[in-house]
Amino acid sequence: MGKVIGIDLGTTNSCVAVMEGGEAVVIPNAEGARTTPSVVGFSKTGERLVGQVAKRQAVSNPDRTIQSIKRYMGTNHKVSIDGKDYSPQEISAMILSKLKADAEAYLGESVTQAVITVPAYFSDAQRQATKDAGKIAGLEVLRIINEPTAAALAYGLDKEGDQTIQVFDLGGGTFDVSILELGDGVFEVKSTSGNNRLGGDDFDQRIVDFLVAEFKKETGVDLSKDKMAMQRLKESAEKAKIELSGVLSTNVNLPFISVGADGPLHLDVNISRAKFDELTADLVEKTMGPTRQALADSGLETNEINKVLMVGGSTRIPAVQEAVRKFLGKEPHKGINPDECVALGAAIQAGVLAGEVKDVLLLDVTPLSLGIETLGGVFTKLIDRNTTIPTSKSQIFSTAADNQPSVEIHVLQGERQMAADNKTLGRFQLSGIPPAPRGVPQIEVKFDIDVNGIVSVSAKDMGTGTVQSISITGGTGGLSDDEINRMVNEAEKFAEEDKKRKEAVEVKNQADSLIYQAEKTIKDLGENADKAKVEAVQKAVEELRTAMNGNDTDLIKNKLEELTKPLHELTADLYQQQQAQQAAAQGGCAGGNCGGQAEKDNVVDADYEVKDDNK
């Protein structure tokens, strides 16, 4: 079994780690950074850019740059570039492919398996979408684990004794809070809650809105209509947010942000931490609802929580830390890196699956209740939230009308009382029910949740033994096997195109180098050069230059070879000329004509006498 990597596929940044020598280590990317921006860009020439290079060109190319795609996982959202629609799974797969390539470069071997983390509050559709993204990227996803649980693994692997911890995970686009009990290598999740639409992006947006309002008040110009200006504002807002975690005030200065009647307009606004706290107070308060819910579901009191782990870059915001401190009455634990601990935890779980890590048992839970729609549009729960997974549960139902020949099983996920208010996971029919009065047929509905939190449901007519089942494959926004296979093939095709593009660049670089060498050789030979050989080289150089103007890599390779032979002959002439010059120089010295030797021969010894003036 090859190396299994752990991936934190984040909203704004992603990270990859692996077990080495019994320890989880973060794998740096090709640019040398330990995290990779979850950004995908398409250049004007159609080249795909991922990570820091994509983020750098976002200001000048906002319409063709995709950020925070994780927020759309498990939905029908599509991104249209050059007339082609991309699903969130495909965009996420591009990010995963970059992380996979970086891991392969670091490890020096092929990587085909991974553990990928998701927010604890991700629905079944979002989990399935994440698994599909991995498949498109050429990865077998051995396990999907929850981000707070992964962070707890990273924190608690080397800890002794029993303790209860709360993981407060506020990332770029999602928020989770989980309570776990740790002891003797067992990591048991007691409860989890969260909000999949709350994260650092929302804090950034508050600053952007404030800057737009201030600029409009001062100049009358509405920057929200200018995509390029908005991208600059978004980048500056993120920097300001980060700076305000360490200082009490920061300045946002963006020259030439727009143009007015009298010429260029510049944005220059000071933002204090107090102002930032005021702008985002309701967002901080939104984190407290799930925090209270998780504590209530765990059946614990605040004084029974031993430690609070702060996970995700947004937990560096002072107001967030203060809210947690106030609620739990204790200082948040800052002994782990909030940007890397989730990937490290994923790598540890990967190590468990690969047999590298022993005596670790992870007991996670399902974040939302699961059930079916019953008579009157009621949501009947079969599996309650915070049930340890994997799990299986069945219940007997019956028909709602006399002689009903079939029933539709409407599978739902959520906490509301009515079916219409919950998330539909799928529907399927159980047919062939023999005629009978209502309430007589017995239909067993069985739910199974695997270790990844992915659901499958079956219905069985107890009278006839007829069984119908559905494996939930993403519900809304889910991909069929055919769609996934098509996307896998496209991803492989792109990888091949990328390889060809890289080869074309390398061949052109070789050609440039050889042309430079040819011209330098001709110059060094000067008047002593064999004219026929020079003409042959010059002709080959011109043909190579012409080939380089096109995109036919094979033609350039051929012309490279055609230049190499006459150039070798010319280089041999240059070498012989240099050898002759060196021999002539040495011969001159041997004849006594070297300057140093002549001077030595002309030295005359002089007699001298010392006079003593005191005599």
UniProtKB/Swiss-Prot annotation:
**Keywords annotated in UniProt:** ATP-binding, Chaperone, Nucleotide-binding, Phosphoprotein, Stress response
Q: Where is the composition biased (Basic and acidic residues)?
A: 598-615
Q: What induces it, per record? A: By stress conditions e.g. heat shock.
**Protein family per UniProt:** Belongs to the heat shock protein 70 family.
Q: Where is this region: Disordered?
A: 581-615
Q: Fetch the PANTHER family from UniProt.
A: HEAT SHOCK PROTEIN 70KDA
Question: According to its UniProt entry, what is the function of this protein?
Answer: Acts as a chaperone.
Output the superkingdom of the source species.
Bacteria
Q: Which GO terms describe its molecular function?
A: ATP binding; ATP-dependent protein folding chaperone; unfolded protein binding
PTM-bearing positions, type Phosphothreonine? 174
Recorded protein name is: Chaperone protein DnaK
Organism, as annotated: Desulforamulus reducens (strain ATCC BAA-1160 / DSM 100696 / MI-1) (Desulfotomaculum reducens)
Q: Which Pfam families match?
A: HSP70
Q: Which cysteines are joined by disulfide bonds?
A: none
SUPFAM superfamilies, per the entry: Actin-like ATPase domain, Heat shock protein 70kD (HSP70), C-terminal subdomain, Heat shock protein 70kD (HSP70), peptide-binding domain
